[in-house]
Amino acid sequence: MLRFPHVCGLCLLLKYWQILALAPFRTSEPMVARCQRWMTLIAVFRWLLLTSMAPFVLWKSAAMYEATNVRHSMVFKTIALATMTGDVCISLALLGNHLWNRRELANLVNDLARLHRRRRLSWWSTLFLWLKLLLSLYDLLCSVPFLKGAGGRLPWSQLVAYGVQLYFQHVASVYGNGIFGGILLMLECYNQLEREEPTNLARLLQKEYSWLRLIQRFVKLFQLGIFLLVLGSFVNIMVNIYAFMSYYVSLHGVPLTISNNCLVLAIQLYAVILAAHLCQVRSAKLRKKCLQLEYVPEGLTQEQAMASTPFPVLTPTGNVKFRILGVFILDNSFWLFLVSYAMNFIVVILQTSFEHINHGEI
C-alpha cells in the first residue's frame, strides 16, 4: 500500500478506506494507486449486496427495540428508524459516489501521497488527527454495552442486522476522518509556505497556483460527500438533542449515552469545518503576502510589467473556497449558522414540552 513517510495516521486512514470500500482501488509501491477491473467488480458486488440488504437491516434494527427492557415511545422509535434510514442512505451514496469516481479518487490520492513526501504533517496536526481517529473508535465502542445487555436475547438475524447497521454508521465517520486528514495535509502546506523566506517569488506563485488547483479538485470530488456528511451529522445532532431534552423534561435526568453521542457528533463535525476554515484563512494570507511582494517577471522593471503584462500573471490566482454544491461555504460562519439553528430548536422543544406538562399530557 502507499507509504506516507511519517507516522501520522494517514496511512491507516487509507487502509481503512480500502477495507470499508471507500477507496475501491489497489495501492502498491512506488506510491501508486491503480484502478483494476477485479477490484471494481468486487466493489460493485459489495455495493449491490449492501443495497439489497438495507431494507432487511432497517426492519431488523427497528425490531431490536422490542428486545430491550426500556420502554420507548412511538415518537422515539420513529425518530430512531428515520435516523438509521438516513445513515444507511448516506453511506450507500458515499460508497456509490466513490465507486463512480474511482479514477479521479485514485489520481487525487496519488497527488496527495506525492505531496506528503515533501510536506509532512506537524506533530500538532498528527495529534489532532489521532484524536479524531480515537473519537471515532470511542463512538464505535459505545455499542458494546448494548451488545452485553441485550445481545444474549437477540436472535442471530438481528445481531447480523445490527452489525451491518454499525458498518453503515461507521462508514460516515471514517469518511469524515479522511476528509479531515486530507484538509490537514493541505493546511500544513500553506503553513510551511507561510514560514518560508520568499527568495523566489515566481516559484512561490507557482506553488500557490498548484495548491489552489489541488484544493479545487479535492472540493469538486468530495463536495457531494461533504454535503451528505454535514447533513447527516446535523440531523443526528438534532435528533439527539430532541431525545435528550425529552428525557430531561419528562424524567428530570441526564441521559449520559445520548449526551455523549451528541457531543461526539458535534466535535467530529466541527473538526472538519474548522480545518476547512483554517485552510481558507491560510490561503488568503498567502495571497495577500504575494500581493504585498509586488512580483515582477525577470527582465522587466516594475513600470514595464505594469504596462505590458496581463494582470493575472502579476497576481495570485485567487482564494481557496470550500463551496459545497453551491449551497454553503464550509467555514466558521456556517458553523455559527448551525449552532444558532440548534439553539432555536432547543428553545422550541423546551417550550413545547413545558406546554404539554402544563396541560397534563406528560
Swiss-Prot record:
Extracellular topological segments: 60-74, 148-166, 245-255, 355-362
Q: Which UniProt keywords apply?
A: Cell membrane, Membrane, Receptor, Transducer, Transmembrane, Transmembrane helix
Q: What is its main location?
A: membrane
Q: Looking at the keywords, is Signal present?
A: no
The terms under GO molecular function for this entry are:
ligand-gated monoatomic ion channel activity; taste receptor activity
**Where is it localised?**
Cell membrane
- Look up the record and give one Gene Ontology term from the biological process aspect: detection of chemical stimulus involved in sensory perception of taste
The residues on the Cytoplasmic side of the membrane are 1-38, 96-126, 188-223, 277-333
Report the membrane topology from the UniProt record: Multi-pass membrane protein
List GO terms (cellular component aspect): axon; dendrite; membrane; neuronal cell body; plasma membrane
Query: What exactly does this protein do?
Result: Probable gustatory receptor which mediates acceptance or avoidance behavior, depending on its substrates.
- Please give the family membership noted in the entry: Belongs to the insect chemoreceptor superfamily. Gustatory receptor (GR) family. Gr77a subfamily.
Write the protein's name.
Putative gustatory receptor 89a
Q: Which species is the source of this protein?
A: Drosophila melanogaster (Fruit fly)
